[in-house]
C-alpha cells in the first residue's frame, strides 16, 4: 500500500502546468486613433506609432511579428519584432477604397499564438 501511494505522489508532479495563451488588452491600432466606423484615414508618408498591450498569464516571454495586408504598396515598419513599432503609411493603393490592415502575431514560445488585426486604414494621397 505504501508503495502505491508513493508512486501516485510522484506521478502527480509529472503533469506540466497548462500554458495560457497571451491576451491582447489594447490594439493593435495607431496610438491615439479614435474608434470610428468604417476605418481610419492617414496621409501617405505619415509615421504612425502603433499601440499594442499584451498580457501573458504565465509570464512567458512574448514575441511579436507584424505584417501588412495587402503587402503592396508596402508601408515601412520600424521593426516587425517589437510590441510597438512605428509604421510609415505607403502611397495609396490603385483603388483608393482598398483598406490596409496591420496584423500582429503574438507568440509566447509555448505554442500560445494569437493574431491581432488593426482597424481598416485608408491612405490619403499627398
Locate the predicted segments by residue.
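Proline-centered linker/hinge motifs at extracellular inter-domain junctions
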Residues: 19-23, 28-31, 85
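Low-complexity "stalk/linker" and mucin-like segments enriched in Ser/Thr/Pro/Ala/Gly
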Residues: 32-38, 68-84
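Short, solvent-exposed loop/linker segments at the N-terminal edge
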Residues: 38-46
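A short beta-strand segment in extracellular, disulfide-stabilized domains
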Residues: 45-54
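Exposed beta-strand face motif in extracellular beta-rich ectodomains
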Residues: 48, 96-102
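Extracellular acidic, Ser/Thr/Pro-rich low-complexity tracts
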Residues: 53-58, 106-108
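Solvent-exposed loop segments of extracellular immunoglobulin-like
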Residues: 60-65
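Solvent-exposed segments in extracellular or luminal domains encompassing
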Residues: 82-96
Amino acid at each position: 500500500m505504501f508503495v502505491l501511494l508513493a508512486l501516485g505522489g510522484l506521478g502527480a508532479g509529472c503533469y506540466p502546468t497548462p500554458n495560457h495563451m497571451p491576451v491582447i488588452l489594447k490594439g493593435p491600432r495607431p496610438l491615439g486613433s479614435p474608434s470610428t466606423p468604417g476605418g481610419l484615414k492617414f496621409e501617405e508618408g505619415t509615421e504612425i506609432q502603433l499601440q499594442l498591450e499584451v498580457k501573458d498569464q504565465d509570464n512567458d516571454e512574448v514575441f511579436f511579428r507584424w505584417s501588412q495586408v495587402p503587402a503592396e504598396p508596402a508601408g515601412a515598419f520600424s521593426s516587425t519584432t517589437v510590441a510597438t513599432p512605428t509604421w510609415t503609411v505607403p502611397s495609396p493603393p490603385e483603388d483608393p477604397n482598398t483598406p490596409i490592415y496591420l496584423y500582429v502575431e503574438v507568440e509566447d514560445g509555448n505554442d500560445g499564438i494569437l493574431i491581432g488585426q488593426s482597424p481598416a486604414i485608408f491612405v490619403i494621397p499627398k
